[in-house]
A protein has these predicted regions:
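Acidic, small-residue rich beta-repeat scaffolds with periodic aromatic anchors
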Residues: 5, 18-25, 94-98, 105-183
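Bacterial N-terminal signal peptides that target proteins for export
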Residues: 1-10
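Structural motif
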Residues: 38-40, 81-89, 145-157
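Hydrophobic h-region of N-terminal signal peptides that target proteins for export
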Residues: 10-19
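Surface loop/turn motifs at the tips and blade-to-blade linkers of beta-strand repeat domains
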Residues: 53-58
């Protein structure tokens, strides 16, 4: 695990950390995301509520963003080599966890591979602040084997709809990418 500098974006409510025992507290101070060998949601006493990510060994950077109302949190994992993943949690009466579906970005990747005449070789994303208490802005970069690069952005929105649990305990269909655009 590479140790990255801690970068605070106070206005956006975003903190980038290495996975070395860093707690990123919610604005109300009642919860935190703890990044260690795993990424967990904890309460103010340090008791684990949810495991968001079971293994951070391939992560170069973990970025955490709490919504201003402390009811939503988004975590971006950027790998040391190729890609990134986004997991999140939200609270109604209890905490739930969800994951951004890879199929959502699949059409974008296929279109850009055709445009740049090469396969995707690297992809990284970062958070760009909260648009609303349940929508966060995301920016991404794709690099293709042809040498081309594509910079893009989109909105990641929480949806409160009945879903099903996948094998990892994530509620599917709760985190939706929309408004994809070039930067």
């Amino acid at each position: 695990m590479k140790i990255t500098d801690i970068l605070t974006y106070a206005a956006a409510g975003i903190l980038a950390v290495s996975s070395q025992a860093k707690d990123v507290h919610s604005p109300d101070g009642r919860f935190a995301v703890r990044a260690e060998a795993t990424i967990s949601l904890i309460d103010s006493s340090g008791n684990q509520i949810l495991t968001l990510v079971r293994d951070t060994s391939g992560d170069a950077k973990v970025e955490v963003a709490w919504s201003p109302d402390s009811r939503h949190v988004v975590v971006v994992e950027n790998g040391e080599r190729v890609g990134s993943g986004i997991v999140a949690a939200w609270k109604d009466e209890v905490w739930h966890k969800t994951i951004e579906s890879e199929s959502q970005e699949g059409a974008l990747i296929q279109a850009q591979q055709a445009k740049f005449h090469g396969r995707l070789v690297a992809e990284h994303r970062k958070l760009d602040g909260w648009k609303s208490p349940s929508e966060v802005l995301v920016q991404g970069d794709m690099t293709f084997s042809s040498g081309g690069n594509y910079h893009y952005g989109y909105t990641l929105a929480f949806r409160q709809v009945p879903g099903r649990l996948d094998r990892g305990g994530y509620e599917e269909g709760q985190l939706i990418g929309k408004d994809y655009h070039s930067l």
